[in-house]
A protein has these predicted regions:
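Conserved phosphate- and dinucleotide-binding cores of soluble alpha/beta proteins
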Residues: 196-250
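Short glycine-rich anion-binding loops that position phosphate/pyrophosphate groups of nucleotides
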Residues: 62, 171-173, 242-245
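Active-site pocket-lining segments that scaffold enzyme catalytic pockets across diverse folds
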Residues: 133-170, 174
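Solvent-exposed alpha-helices and their adjacent loops that cap or buttress functional pockets
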Residues: 10-12, 18-21, 56, 148, ...
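Flexible, glycine/proline-enriched loop segments at strand-loop-helix junctions
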Residues: 99-103, 138-144, 163-165, 193-196, ...
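Short Gly/Thr/Asp-enriched flexible loops that form oxyanion-binding sites at enzyme active sites
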Residues: 174-182, 248-250
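Long amphipathic alpha-helical segments
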Residues: 9, 14-126, 130
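Active-site histidine-anchored catalytic micro-motif
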Residues: 147, 181-193, 200-204
Length: 250
């Protein structure tokens, strides 16, 4: 059996601990209170998945697997209906879920469209639609994690052996894969995490992932990055879609 790419990542970056469909329900890690409390929001209707996304139960890249698993749940909900009604139900679910959060609407619409394609394949093959959508969701996770792992491999090669990193917000899988690769290469990174108000993603999520994966991490306030960059010889600054490598000799 092929090793899953989330192996050896921190707890909250493993598939089942982001959003997971099973037995007619979707379970989503509640990042609003993590890591102080490890609790999950359980959804038994696709509209509850959409509401959880709206309510910031999950954020960063979390809404995308949540949307995919929500589509699997929608397929389960309408499984006894005639095929034409199932199609209409899933289309309605895709519309509702994709609009759950305006800032992620375009990408979530693409996710939902991919799950509708999986549903069509399942109908044509006479297979359970919810299982087919869940399988497609896991494939999407695998593909994204492997791409990020490849990027992390090339990125970490450029890190100093004892480098200092400044983060911003919570870069989800990027930070996990980067640290996994750094650990494999024996690089003892020192990490500074701004708190990231108002949800404190840096203090709660990034710092927790770094600590759990065995790295020296310090949480700083949001007005401290310039001071830290001046005093601590920062080699790398990154956030979700941006990275800068600094030359320490300059």
């Amino acid at each position: 059996m092929t090793e899953r790419p989330d192996k050896d990542l921190a707890f909250m970056l493993q598939y089942e601990n982001i959003a997971w469909y099973e037995d007619g329900a979707v379970r989503i890690l509640d990042r609003r209170c993590y890591p102080h409390t490890v609790s999950f929001v359980t959804c038994t209707h696709y509209s509850e998945v959409a509401q959880a996304i709206t309510d910031m139960v999950t954020q960063s890249a979390g809404p995308y697997p949540a949307a995919a698993m929500g589509m699997a749940l929608a397929a389960y909900e309408c499984r006894e209906k005639p095929e034409a009604e199932q199609r209409a139900f899933l289309r309605e679910a895709a519309d509702r879920i994709s609009r759950a959060r305006p800032t992620t609407a375009r990408r979530m619409a693409r996710v939902c469209e991919t799950m509708l394609e999986a549903a069509e394949s399942a109908w044509n093959a006479g297979e359970p639609v919810d299982r087919a959508i869940k399988a497609r969701a896991i494939e999407a996770n695998n593909s994204r994690y492997r791409k990020i792992a490849t990027i992390a491999t090339h990125l970490v090669e450029r890190f100093p052996k004892d480098g200092t990193i400044l983060t911003q917000c919570f870069a989800e899988t990027i930070v996990g894969m980067m640290l996994k690769e750094a650990r494999a290469k024996g690089k003892a990174l020192r990490i500074f995490c701004p708190e990231t108000r108002p949800y404190f993603q840096g203090a709660r999520l990034t710092a927790t992932v770094c600590c759990e994966m065995g790295f020296d991490v310090t949480v700083i306030t949001d007005n401290m990055p310039a001071f830290v960059m001046q005093r601590e010889h920062v080699d790398v600054f990154y956030r979700q879609q941006f990275l800068n490598l600094f030359n320490r000799s300059v």
